[in-house]
Amino acid sequence: MSSEHVDVLVVGAGISGISAAHHLQTQCPDKSFLILEGRDSIGGTWDLFKYPVIRSDSDMYTLGFSFRPWRDPKAIADGPSIMSYLRSAVEDDGLHDKIRFGRKVVKALWSSQEAHWELTVLNTRSQQEETLTCGFVHMCTGYYNY
């Protein structure tokens, strides 16, 4: 079982996780962080659901990132447009190397003695468990359980 420590673990690489990572990188540049994503792609809901008429229920001027204004004239965006927006945000911020794909958190324990979180994470590709420790866990897992 491998072990690694970072200051912050972000769980989920959807819209919330990408936003959290952006703010960690820009507002806390001295802090180390990783993003754990259970699937093999960023985007969460917007990557998972690919039926032809998927679209946002909220306008993208509100749903989008404050640090990356939505520029498309369509306020209610389709899924592929939202995915393009998210991919661009990850690319522009250089976040791809911070994302560990195929990682599912199976247990999180707080150690008062060590003053950190210890997470047991399943690598779904190798089926091996990894142990990661951190000072903070930022849960960005979204609404759906997949």
Residue ranges and their predicted role:
Residues 3-35:
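N-terminal Rossmann-like FAD-binding beta1-loop-alpha1 element of flavoenzymes
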Residues 4, 29, 42, 115-117, ...:
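Core residues of folded domains in eukaryotic genome-function proteins
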Residues 16, 41, 144:
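Conserved Rossmann-like nucleotide-cofactor binding loop
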Residues 24-26, 48-51, 115:
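Short, glycine/charged-enriched secondary-structure capping and boundary segments
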Residues 26-30, 39, 93-95:
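Short, solvent-exposed loop/edge-beta patches enriched in aromatic
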Residues 38-88:
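Glycine-rich active-site loop/strand segments that organize a redox cofactor
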Residues 73-146:
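Feature captures the FAD/FMN-dependent oxidoreductase FAD-binding
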